[in-house]
Amino acid sequence: MAAALLVIDVQRALLDELAPDRSAAFVDTLKHVLEDARATGCPVVYVRHDGSPYELLPGTPGWEVATEIAPLPGEPIVEKRFRDAFRETNLADVLSTLGVDELFVSGMQTEFCVDATVREAERRGFRVTLVEDAHATSPGGGLTEEQIRSHMHRVLRDEIARIVPSGELFESLRKVTSE
């Protein structure tokens, strides 16, 4: 079997909600993650949210995948309407066609779409790795982004997903793709 990298909802409208310095650092990390995945032959699958809020309506500028990390020709984009990227989408079919049984997950928003997709992937029997510094969110509920991300790592770690920093991703992907 094989692994795939999921890039969830890194769309212009969501990226623009991050502080400019955080947005730049996040995009830079994602660029390196994408380079590592592609260098090891790991397929990259994008997920794009369609719908509310208004900025994510299909065809609007905010709906587009951020150009800095845009898919290469042939890399699939799965359109979704719910937090869980598997719900009422063709994601399971795309992953099945690719022979994937392990997912490396990146994207936005940590406590919403990333969390829901990681949990559903694990429930469906995928081995799941969350790339520790390749997911982001906006501050909310009196919590900073770092507090939200750290909490998600504590909740998901080991029981649901491995947590791996992007600096160790290439080696992890190389091991999986050479099996």
What annotation goes with each model-predicted range?
Residues A2-A4, K31-T40, E55-E179:
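Active-site-adjacent betaalpha module
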Residues L6-V10:
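N-terminal nucleotide-binding beta1-loop-alpha1 segment
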Residues R12-D16:
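Short acidic, Gly/Ser-rich segments with clustered Asp/Glu that frequently serve as metal-coordination loops
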Residues E17-A24, F104-Q109:
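Short, glycine-rich nucleotide/cofactor-binding loops
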Residues A19-Y46:
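A short alpha/beta connector and helix-capping loop motif
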Residues H49-D50, M108:
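Short, well-ordered beta-to-alpha junction loops that form the rim of enzyme active sites
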